[in-house]
Amino acid sequence: MMVNYREKRRMLIKYGVSLPVAAGLGSLLSVPPARAQPPNDVHKFKISLNVYSFNRLLRAGTIDLFDVLTFCAEHNFDAIDPTGYYFPGYPDVPSDEYVNRFKRQAFLLGLDISGTGVRNDFVQPDPVQRKADVAMVTQWVEAAARLGIPNVRVFAGTHKHEGYSRDQVFEWMAQDIKTCCQHGKEYGVMVAIQNHNDFLKTAADVDRILTMVDSDWLGLNLDIGSYRQGDPYQEIEKNVRHAITWQIKENVWVNGQETPADFVKLFRIIKKAGYRGYLPLETLGEGDPYEKVPRLLENVRQALQQI
């Protein structure tokens, strides 16, 4: 009898049956299991480092991205998230030679490259300047594809947009982000908009822009430290379904007060949502990142053991 392996594989994926077990099931495959979809608590977390944690040293030229790769390997991170600012020549994209050297070194150190990001402002009323930012994002989408990076992080923006309403800003921002997402689709790279306490301040703001763009190639870079009105954990719960990557910071803001993050509470929210992917860590403020990052990493690892 001729075996339709394509159909068989489709059913195995659908019902989650492993190949060795499925080989002996025969006609039983026609009976769907009680739960054909993964349960809500199926999750997989991979710890990455957002390179902004080393911003001061990188800006000063004391270290470079290759030094941060070594640091990530020494501390057994799963991945690195190198923001575009730290590549040579930014806002221009890095050369092929640099891209290939960076990819090679990350691979040899056992590190994924989980994301990158640019500095843009889609709140800017001037369409010429916004068009330039869209062009920059699309160039970095292509660079991300060359680097094997699955997403490019963008901001909403900080411009005061005098003379224009928030509704107007949302309209032109949605169109600009759609253009970026269309380019991302061509290159297999998602656009991750970050809630950065800029134009996007609340979970409702995030919901609104994602609904308006309505693209499978747009997701949320969920920044836990940038919900600064009310209860951040409630805001995170409202937006977690949109998250495709994160910025896990030491502190959150509870009713306007900076407070150490409750990582156990946070990771239970993320786990309950069934999130699977990278959790990039980012330290901010004064202090030595060679001390601060390992401390944050240890706190995160301890919290993950409790969920």
Placement of each model-derived feature along the sequence:
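Histidine-acidic metal/acid-base catalytic patches
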Residues: 2-28, 32-76, 200-307
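Generic detector of well-ordered alpha-helical packing
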Residues: 82, 122, 195, 222-224, ...
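Conserved beta-strand positions in the central sheet of alpha/beta enzyme cores
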Residues: 81, 115-117, 153, 247, ...
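Glycine-rich, proline-tolerant flexible connector loops at the mouths of alpha/beta enzymes
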Residues: 82-102, 157-160
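Metal-dependent catalytic neighborhoods of phosphoester/phosphodiester hydrolases
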Residues: 90-99, 127-130, 290-292
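Asp-box/BNR beta-propeller blade signature and adjacent active/binding-site loops
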Residues: 80, 106, 255-256
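Active-site acidic/histidine proton-transfer and metal-coordination neighborhood
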Residues: 16-26, 37-41, 99-115, 120-219, ...
